Amino acid sequence: MMKRLLGLVMLLLFTCTLLTGCNTARGFGEDIKHLGNSISHAAS
């Protein structure tokens, strides 16, 4: 039980850190879009 709770807390902290780094969920989406565009241009 304690390991599961600790795992959920760590996942929540990781997710919050990731979203904070991109400022918002919208910013995260834009970052993924730019990454996709970069990959497309590199493949061309």
Swiss-Prot record:
Lipid moiety-binding region (N-palmitoyl cysteine): C22
Organism listed in the record: Citrobacter freundii
NCBIfam families: PRK09810.1
Compartment list: Cell membrane
Name listed for the protein in its UniProt record: Entericidin A
Positions where lipid (S-diacylglycerol cysteine) attaches: C22
Gene Ontology terms: cellular component: plasma membrane
Function (record text): Acts as antidote to the effect of entericidin B.
